[in-house]
Amino acid sequence: MGQLTITRRVCLCPTTSLRLPTPHHFARSFSITQKVMGPTKRPAEEGDRSISPPPLKRKAQTAISKSAVASFFTPVSQKPKDRTTWTEKSPDADSPATLLVAKYVPEGSPTNDESVNTTVKRRKIAAFDLDSTLITSASGKKHSHDAADWKWWHHSVPDRLRKLYNEEGYQVIIFTNQGGLTLHASPSSSSSSSKPKTPKAQLDRVPQFKQKCSAVLSQLDIPTTLYAATGKDIYRKPRPGMWLEMKADYNLFNDDDIDLENSIFVGDAGGRQSELPPNSNGRIKATATPKDFSCSDRNLAHNVGIQYQTPEEFFLGEEPRNFTRDFDLVKYPYPSSPTTTDPDSSSSSSSSKKEEILFTKTSPQELVLFVGPPGAGKSTFYWRHLKPLGFERVNQDVLKSKDKCLKAATEYLKEGDSVVVDNTNPDPDTRKQWVELAKKQGVPVRCVWFRTPLVVCEHNDAVRALNKPLNPESRTSLPKLAFNSFNSRFKEPKVKEGFQDVTEVDFKFRGTKEEYEIWGKYWI
């Protein structure tokens, strides 16, 4: 009976009707009784201090402010008005908008127009990247999964920015690349379909991003502007487009309107290399600090002529780490003319008059085959060195197919003209068709090999695509795949392929000083 009583106490699950216990119930109750009535631990003897005390609960440090938590639980009807104004901008009149601009004006401040056009201009700019510089994800993931998934990168960030604005006279600006955002759906390639090519999930990221940025700016609560580049155009860091828009928005047009010496850009993309910090007493193996994903933030600061620091240097006072650039402009300075020691040889007029001779015609009629990756400088070389010698040009970017190139070259040769094949021609199989054409037409075939490093080619391609004065054929920028594809197929050209000679051209900037002002910035 005692065991039955215990069973009733254990089996507290609700039932719809009262049933008498069955043998099955007694079997279960016996099992349960064995567990309940098992041996217990002996009581600790008095004075026994071998038992550890319970662990102390420590309050975890967090960068999430109390106001953020309060705002999250506040009903929408009771939340203050959003002080952030959003606009969109295009790189030119013929392109869609790719730049998101958020202007925040605290309550009680002048209106947007008045704050921008104020007669008292702040000459010092403190510009910051957004992700991994001012904020990071609260979830610990690489990318925020929703608008609320963020926290300050370090708890000192908001107070430091407020001090810059309120006490040190800086204008605080935010520049961020947001390539994962699409402002407007791409039109469908099919005329019969009205559905956009851009996935809906990608379009949904824009309102989430706006909501997150509005919360960040609201907590910061100082007059500021955030610029978010969503395309691979002039706005994307390290390109200067966002900086130029900021200058226009704040009426900073004159050379002395900005104190460049005391202005600064802070961002995590500094080209830092992975390093092993010193071990702790030599006993614990140190963990390597990760390598930066790019050098775009450091390069933007270089392009606009201001100081650069990483978040660790600016907010935490850490010492700078070593950094490298895949493409370093230091290796490609503006050259003086190699044919003269005239003090004015660096001027555009002098360099154009005394052009370096890199190619000479050796026969009345020739077929010249260019070999080199996209952006190696092949077309520029033609215009400056071979066109003046009377060569006609065949280019697949213009004619759109190899067959059309072969047909055009054949017609030029039949008319007695010399021809340049201005294509990449990476491998012997591709070059063989042109060697056979030259033999068939009875003209010598020569090769000019452009030994331009791939990273310089990518730089040249970006310079050409983003600057109309240097893009007479209005070419668009190429994907990285185009450069990697050439590299995978490339075989060094040899005289034994049938060439009369192979002229090697190493890259160095050849152009006017005005052109170098554009070329001599970081574009990738």
What is each residue range found by the language model?
Residues Q441-D461:
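Conserved phosphate-donor/acceptor-positioning beta-strand/loop module used by diverse small-molecule
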Residues L389-R446:
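Conserved nucleotide-sensing/catalytic segment adjacent to the nucleotide-binding pocket
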Residues P374:
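The conserved Walker
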Residues G2-L130, T136-K142, D146, S192-S193, ...:
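Non-catalytic pre-domain segments flanking phosphatase-related domains
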Residues G377-K378:
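Conserved glycine(s) of the Walker
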Residues T225-L226, K232-F253, I258-S263, G267-F314, ...:
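Conserved GTP-binding G-domain of TRAFAC-class P-loop NTPases and closely related GTPase folds
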Residues K142-I173, A185-S186, S193-S214, R236-P240:
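Short, acidic loop-to-helix structural element flanking the phosphoryl-transfer center
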Residues F370:
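Hydrophobic anchor at the beta1->P-loop junction of P-loop NTPases
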